[in-house]
Design a protein with these regions (language model features):
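Solvent-exposed, polar/charged alpha-helical surfaces in well-ordered, non-transmembrane soluble domains
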Residues: 48, 52, 56, 77, ...
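An extracytoplasmic/periplasmic, membrane-proximal ligand-sensing/linker region
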Residues: 28-30, 174, 214, 261-322
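Bacterial N-terminal signal peptides that target proteins for export
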Residues: 1-9, 20
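N-terminal (or domain-start) structured segment
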Residues: 22-113, 152, 160, 176-200, ...
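C-terminal segment of classical bacterial N-terminal signal peptides
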Residues: 12-22
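Hinge/capping helix and adjacent helix->loop/strand transition within the periplasmic-binding protein
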Residues: 81-87, 102-189, 238, 243, ...
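Hydrophobic alpha-helical segments typical of transmembrane helices
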Residues: 42, 46, 50, 75, ...
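A ligand-binding cleft/hinge motif common to bilobed small-molecule-binding domains
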Residues: 97-106, 170-174, 201-234
Length: 322
């Protein structure tokens, strides 16, 4: 009886030892991080800055691979179906992780089942800006204007179902106002029409908005996160008027489900070490972003809560991207 018990226990101990030893030597070859968007977007610089510093620690290359399409779903699906060995990772964000599970009817993966959270990487803000001819100087005045003119104000976004769109819908719902959504194929044409007065307002990322604010072509009335931005310290957050409003743009590292806990722990520790470096924080700050290292558990909880929040907005606003 004792031998029958000891043999399986020995195998368990050996397996645990092997996993721990494997994690300590990880990585033994280049690590691929998939960005689920076309090259040249804002997440490229975020992940390349991270990857360069991980390469210094590991002595192994970090290869950034852009796999754009379907709102981030194609790249995310590539990682969901990859071997769970730590050598293929996803730089995930709200689109493929917390929005698309509700927005897309036939998603080829389940974000909370098919991925293991590793660490949050960065977070940034959107800016709510208006055409200068609009009399509103803050979000309270803006929503009062919309309430007094139901269906008269038009807001732009870079497409249906993205954070610019959903952020405005959440604000509209919380304020109890009616506005018209005008989707564009990207932020650039939306800004052209905002500056020319074809649309009245829009949410957009802070880096893309700042040049237009500084040249007074648009007026910033609020930022989308719970706290103000160091880049626009005089611009209040929406949450100062509508409590609980918090729509950050963010990214995090995810591994395929089944990746060993030891490798996830090694990745998490090294990513946190890199994100705490002063040179990386400065680099991110130049892009209007903040390094936001986290535990895997904290990222998992963020994903869970945000998925519920966006599901509520999508259903309440009857958003349909298909």
């Amino acid at each position: 009886m004792r031998q029958g018990v000891l043999l399986p226990m020995g195998l368990v101990v050996m397996g645990a030892w092997f996993n721990a030893a494997h994690a300590q030597s990880y990585p033994l070859k280049p690590v691929r991080i998939v960005v689920p968007y076309a090259a040249g977007g804002p997440y490229d610089e975020i992940v390349r800055t991270l990857g360069q510093r991980l390469t210094e620690i590991w002595g192994q290359a970090v290869v950034v691979e852009n796999r754009g399409g379907a709102g981030g779903n194609i790249g995310a699906d590539v990682v969901a179906k990859a071997a769970p060995d730590g050598y293929t990772l996803l730089l995930g964000n709200a689109g493929p992780i917390t929005v698309n599970p509700t927005l897309v009817k036939k998603l080829p993966y389940d974000p909370q089942r098919d991925f293991v959270p590793v660490s949050m990487v960065n977070a940034s803000r959107m800016v709510l800006s208006v055409h200068p001819s609009l009399p509103a100087k803050n979000v309270k005045e803006l929503m009062a204007l919309a309430r007094a003119n139901p269906g008269r104000l038009n807001y732009g976004s870079s497409g249906v179902g993205n954070l610019q769109h959903l952020g405005m819908e959440l604000l509209r719902i919380q304020a109890g106002v009616t506005m018209n959504h005008v989707p564009y194929k990207g932020a650039a044409p939306a800004f052209v029409d905002l500056i020319s007065g074809q649309v009245d307002l829009m949410f957009a990322n802070i880096v893309g908005t700042l040049p237009h604010v500084r040249t007074a072509r648009v007026r910033a009335v609020a930022v989308s996160t719970a706290t103000r931005s160091p880049l626009l310290p005089d611009v209040p957050s929406v949450a100062e008027t509508y409590k609980g409003f918090d729509i950050p743009t963010w990214s995090g590292i995810f591994a395929p489900a089944g990746t060993s806990r030891d490798i996830v722990a090694k990745l998490n520790g090294d990513i946190i070490k890199v994100l705490q470096r002063a040179d990386l924080k400065e680099r991110y700050a130049q892009q209007g972003s903040e390094a936001t290292p986290s535990t895997p558990e904290a990222l998992a909880e963020h994903v869970r809560k945000e998925t519920v929040m966006y599901a509520g907005v999508i259903k309440a606003a009857k958003v349909n991207a298909e």
